[in-house]
Regions:
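Hinge/capping helix and adjacent helix->loop/strand transition within the periplasmic-binding protein
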Residues: 1, 13-100, 147-149, 161-194
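Conserved beta-strand termini and adjacent loop/short-helix elements that scaffold enzyme active sites
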Residues: 5, 69, 93-98, 115, ...
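A ligand-binding cleft/hinge motif common to bilobed small-molecule-binding domains
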Residues: 7-17, 76, 81-85, 107, ...
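Conserved functional loop/turn residues at catalytic and ligand-binding sites
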Residues: 49, 108-109, 126, 151, ...
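Short acidic active-site motifs
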Residues: 100-101, 209
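C-terminal lobe and pocket-closing loops
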Residues: 118-187, 216-219
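Mature extracytoplasmic/periplasmic domains
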Residues: 183, 187, 191-212
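Extracellular/periplasmic bilobal clamshell ligand-binding domains
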Residues: 206-229
């Protein structure tokens, strides 16, 4: 049975909660996308840079509210990294999904937000996108700096990796067959073109690459989330 995964979501939630799923009972097949979190404010916000937002946070501890799609999802991971690296006293507001989190920022219900690059790029006319939580700038937003360029040492651990998986115990020949076919399917010109037309970043990874990524995220998130629930 094929299923879709979203990392860091399922890994973070398996660390914090007593879930029935974790990286030990799932087998990755291949990865098709990697959608970074971006730091956004409303189009009428007085803040134009990460530095300006953090200066306001320093002067007003706890007053800078930042929305995200929920708890222990990519946006929340980006927030935790941002707060830790900047040392700022910030308040996270978990929404009931990415669309609601985006709406909060547009409506001025929160000072800022972390949201998907794909969704934010489609709503760019209603937002200011201050920074990307990734190791490099993105081709869809070439003028938007990374958080590291903005002086905050946040890496790519919150990037939403998306792909396909099967349950552990699936016959190895089935896993091998799917792993040999699925990444090629994701890389087809029509598929990549469709993703690009919706500002959905593609990142094609084979099974071995996904296994390595899962293990890296498991180790990092176990440390980041220690003591949180």
């Amino acid at each position: 049975m094929l299923g879709a995964y979203n990392v860091p979501h399922f890994i973070a939630q398996s660390i914090v909660f007593d879930t029935k799923y974790n990286i030990n009972n799932l087998e990755p097949i291949g990865n098709w996308g990697a959608d970074p979190a971006v730091l956004i404010v409303g189009k009428d916000s007085p803040f134009n840079t990460v530095g300006e937002l953090l200066a306001h946070a320093e002067a007003n501890p706890g007053a800078v509210t930042i929305s995200g799609a929920g708890k222990f999802v990519g946006h929340h991971i980006a927030f935790l990294q941002f707060a830790k690296a900047s040392g700022a006293n910030l308040t996270y507001i978990p929404a009931s999904g990415g669309v609601d989190a985006l709406r909060m920022v547009k409506a001025g219900e929160t000072v800022a937000g972390f949201n998907n690059l794909s969704d934010s790029a489609r709503s760019a006319a209603d937002l200011k996108i201050l920074a990307v939580a990734d190791l490099s700038r993105h081709e869809y937003l070439p003028d938007v700096p990374t958080l590291q360029e903005s002086g905050v040492d946040v890496d790519d651990s919150s990037v939403n990796f998306r792909g396909l998986m099967v349950p552990a115990g699936t016959p190895q020949d089935v896993i091998d067959y799917l792993a040999s076919k699925v990444p090629n399917m994701f890389g087809e010109k029509k598929t990549v073109g469709k993703m690009k037309s919706t500002n959905s970043p593609a990142r094609i990874m084979n099974r071995d690459e996904v296994i390595s990524m899962w293990n890296e995220r498991q180790a990092y998130l176990t440390d980041l989330l220690a003591g949180l629930q």
